[in-house]
Amino acid sequence: MASETKRRRWLPAPFSRRATIVWAVIVAVLLVAGAYFMYDRLANGLGMAGATNSVPWGLWVVVYIWFSGLAGGLYLLSALVYLLRIPRFAPVARMALGLSVVSLVVSMIFIGIDLGAIRHSLGTLLFFHWSSPLAWEIKAYMFFMVVAVAQFVLVLLNDKRAAEAAGEPSMESLRRRGNVNLAIRVLAGVGVATSFVGPPGGTGMFFAAVKTRGLWEGGITSVLFYVMAVVTAAAFLIVAYRLLARLRGARPDGSALVGLNRVLAASLFALAFCVFFQIAPPLLSGDPASATAVGVMVSGSLAPLFWIGLVLIGLVLPTALETWLLFFSPKKFEESRKAHWISFGSDAGVLVGGFLLRFLVVMAALPVTITVPML
């Protein structure tokens, strides 16, 4: 019995048969529904998405940067355990790392769909242009994926060995696990360093390098993408952890949830500052290159999405609710079912706001193009 209890520490409880069947049916339905639209894309090209010379990017790119940011943010959260060794985040570390790999694959699928000729994407891997920011970003993405996959495999191997040795650990098993733990920590450090030039920081750097879009150009864009990634990942991980625990009929770890909520609250404050510094300088400068795009967001056709969707639902309400739950609500209420639902609604609002922020950053800048003279 004691051995079985120790094994459960390392291996999560399996899903029920009913939950597995329901999940398989949902995935099958989504795959069948998406197959038609994928065929339409391959058969009819980008015309089915309404792409033009003036609006070359659209919702696919928005979804791409959402998932790439989610991948980078989840990896950073997993590094709280695998690099910094903060024990309270241990219950969600492996989930964060696994979801990071999945999100990165999904982001690459969406950017592949956005390419005019998907078959030409192989050329970006085979040929390298030293002066191309896109070429550097693709290489950083591939390196980041190799690191993340290798680390995830080692984590699974380490957890399996820990479960097998839970009853009678030997010195040899402890030595092997120690070596694997060191390798995991080294890979985590490499992955965190790569995140500044890969997902999520590299995506922001790529946008900031586009001189023809005044809203994107500038150093704050890269910081904005980085903070957006942490905010989105924290909210997503809280929702996913609660949902999976409910499907397993288990109780989520309260300490891990409190830690994630604190990360979310702090990163929301940082995101608010980043959004302010992204839009305030262009408005104050009056430069048409960027002020026009910001005007579209704050007072033009995209204003309802900005003020109601992003500011109110995505920033103000979640920040106020998370701050109240963490620092001002009674301890008993913080652990109640009502508080859990309030936190769930707050996290859902953050996810909506994070998607809208990426949508606004991409779409508001597209109608405004700067003519860059040839040098």
Residue ranges and their predicted role:
Residues 3, 117, 161, 285-288, ...:
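Structured alpha-helical bundle/scaffold domains in large eukaryotic membrane-trafficking regulators
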Residues 61-66, 94-95, 104-108, 135, ...:
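Hydrophobic alpha-helical transmembrane segments of multi-pass small-molecule transporters/permeases
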Residues 36-49, 53-54, 66-127, 133-167, ...:
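Transmembrane-helix bundle segments that line or gate the permeation/cavity pathway
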Residues 122-126, 288-297, 368-375:
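Membrane-interfacial helical/loop segments at transmembrane boundaries in membrane proteins
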Residues 345-364:
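Final/C-terminal transmembrane alpha-helix of multipass membrane proteins
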Residues 10-14, 20, 24-36, 88, ...:
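Long, contiguous internal "core" modules enriched in hydrophobic/ aromatic residues
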Residues 1-73, 77, 359, 363-371:
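N-terminal signal-anchor module of multipass membrane proteins
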